[in-house]
Amino acid sequence: MDVKTVLIFTVLFGVISNNAAETGIESDSHDALNIGRMFCKPLDQQCNKDLHCCKPLKCRRSNNGRKYCKP
């Protein structure tokens, strides 16, 4: 691979991994950019049928009506 190809892959992968690294409710707008089930949500992050929790966590409804990843 030449330098240009490596650079393109680096930029693309950097954008994807940056979205995965963001946490908190503010990151919800970025969730659509995540590719399928490739990324899972860690403990206490919001989840739904499209945003799965990391195993062995489960998506559970909390007191405020939202769903969060819990053991």
UniProtKB/Swiss-Prot annotation:
Residues 22-37 form a propeptide. The keyword Nucleus does not apply. One of its GO terms (cellular component) is extracellular region. Disulfide bonds join 40-54, 47-59, 53-69. One of its GO terms (molecular function) is toxin activity. Expressed by the venom gland. Residues 1-21 form the signal peptide. It is found in: Secreted. Keywords: Disulfide bond, Ion channel impairing toxin, Secreted, Signal, Toxin. Probable ion channel inhibitor. The presence of a 'disulfide through disulfide knot' structurally defines this protein as a knottin. This is U11-hexatoxin-Hi1a.
